């Protein structure tokens, strides 16, 4: 579906931005590209539909090398849709309807089909009824949804979203991830970039790690976040669940790293040994007990302690 071969790119001042990137994303996959700010994630994504042209290497879409001719770029941009990190870079029409209709209208589609695509796209992102609102009056999360709808209206096969949850509160960010998961279930290939490790386990099937313009690792979320040294080298942090279990493991507890709260709860419940209740409280101390309550929720935390005490 998408393949990058030895892709390199430098900024106009000569500073290297991407160095020899090799990456392959299959049809229908959910992929995350993670790395710290300045790792090259946004620059990488701008190569996926021809906004940027590599200094060296190739971009291959559906087995065909992108040749950057005008006709080729039009075709690629119908197939690969990019949602920018800042929705204000993408929303410029007086109303939501006009913004979402912009792409289909430029394809020369009949008016009734344009209206159908607008209605369908807004419904998918939960923004039906906002057609006549001004985009600049919307909240950050609403703007992000409208920006996604504008790309959906083009009916792309591949959705590429640069930092889709940046600047959003947790509830709004979770809503964006739910939209992307639903699009994946419909068969759309979805790629996101992020330096927020917490959303990766909710979303990704495969993770690529970028640092200083180089691809330094690839694997499942669990494979990536089990490697605490890799995460340190990439100037990231472990998800809270993985960090807790990794700290417990380093303290001598026989636990395996998990990513979800439910898996973490059961790992603590079933794998801690007979004197685990007292060992756990001693290890945590008051401050870390509060962190564990925040992580698991108060009910599950007390269920866990009760179960350990009964062992």
Swiss-Prot record:
Described purpose of this protein according to its UniProt entry: ATP-binding (A) component of a common energy-coupling factor (ECF) ABC-transporter complex. Unlike classic ABC transporters this ECF transporter provides the energy necessary to transport a number of different substrates.
Gene Ontology MF terms in the entry: ATP binding; ATP hydrolysis activity; ATPase-coupled transmembrane transporter activity
The organism's place on the tree of life at top rank: Archaea
Source species taxonomy: Archaea, Methanobacteriati, Methanobacteriota, Methanomada group, Methanobacteria
Keyword Membrane on entry: yes
NCBIfam families for this protein: cbiO
Enzyme Commission code: 7.-.-.-
Protein name, per record: Energy-coupling factor transporter ATP-binding protein EcfA
UniProt subcellular location: Cell membrane
Oligomeric and partner information: Forms a stable energy-coupling factor (ECF) transporter complex composed of 2 membrane-embedded substrate-binding proteins (S component), 2 ATP-binding proteins (A component) and 2 transmembrane proteins (T component).
Topology relative to the membrane: Peripheral membrane protein
């Amino acid at each position: 579906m998408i393949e990058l071969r030895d892709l390199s790119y430098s900024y106009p001042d000569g500073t290297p931005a991407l160095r020899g990137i090799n990456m392959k994303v299959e049809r229908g996959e959910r992929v995350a590209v993670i790395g710290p700010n300045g790792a090259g994630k946004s620059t990488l994504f701008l190569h996926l539909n021809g906004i940027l042209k590599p200094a060296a290497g190739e971009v291959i879409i559906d087995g065909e090398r992108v040749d950057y001719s005008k006709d080729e770029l039009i075709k690629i941009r119908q197939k690969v849709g990019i949602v920018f990190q800042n929705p204000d870079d993408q929303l410029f029409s007086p109303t939501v309807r006009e913004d979402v209709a912009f792409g289909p209208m430029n394809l020369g589609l009949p008016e009734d089909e344009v209206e159908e695509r607008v209605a369908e796209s807004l419904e998918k992102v939960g923004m039906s009824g906002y057609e006549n609102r001004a985009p600049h009056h919307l909240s950050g999360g609403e703007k992000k949804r409208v920006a996604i709808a504008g790309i959906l209206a083009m009916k792309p096969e591949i959705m590429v979203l640069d930092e889709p949850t940046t600047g959003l509160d947790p509830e709004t960010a979770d809503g964006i991830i739910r939209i992307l998961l639903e699009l994946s279930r419909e068969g759309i290939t979805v790629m996101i970039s992020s330096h927020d490790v917490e959303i990766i386990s909710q979303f990704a099937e495969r993770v690529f790690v970028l640092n200083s313009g180089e691809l330094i690792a690839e694997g499942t979320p669990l494979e990536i976040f089990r490697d605490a040294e890799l995460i340190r080298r990439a100037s990231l942090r472990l998800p809270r669940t993985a960090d807790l279990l990794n700290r417990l493991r380093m303290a001598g507890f026989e636990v395996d790293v998990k990513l979800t709260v439910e898996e973490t709860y059961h790992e603590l419940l079933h794998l801690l040994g007979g004197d685990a209740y007292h060992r756990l409280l001693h290890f945590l101390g008051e401050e870390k007990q509060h962190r564990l309550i925040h992580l698991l929720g108060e009910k599950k935390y007390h269920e866990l302690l009760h179960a350990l005490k009964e062992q």
